[in-house]
């Protein structure tokens, strides 16, 4: 299981390296899954949203905009149990990021702007 991020799909300008590496993990995971499709190896990608952890300090762990860690873990475990063949594990909180590009360029750009503005406010 590889762990990318919702920010692999809509980058946060204040953390460009983090977002770029998570996008690379997403790309790598897709390629690896394709390369191993004729084997018994399952390649799964976990795509977390913004989660309350101490990754960037205590402030992040208490940020009300972030998903509580226990909620995230509970939802991930539920998905793993109910969808054992899932190639991507996406909790509902990450859907806006994961599927932003599918909304079209104009909506994507608006979402990108709103996301980045909200993190600076």
Locations of regions flagged by a protein language model:
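Active-site loop immediately N-terminal to the catalytic Tyr-X3-Lys motif
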Residues: 12-16
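Residue(s) in the substrate-gating loop at a strand-loop-helix junction
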Residues: 5
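Short, flexible catalytic-loop segment of classical short-chain dehydrogenase/reductase
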Residues: 48-58
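Rossmann-fold scaffold of SDR-type NAD(P)-dependent oxidoreductases
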Residues: 2
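Active-site helix of classical SDR
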Residues: 21
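Non-catalytic terminal and boundary segments that flank Rossmann-like NAD(P)-dependent oxidoreductase
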Residues: 107-121
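C-terminal helical subdomain
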Residues: 45, 61-105
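Active-site-adjacent segment of SDR/Rossmann-fold oxidoreductases
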Residues: 10, 31-42
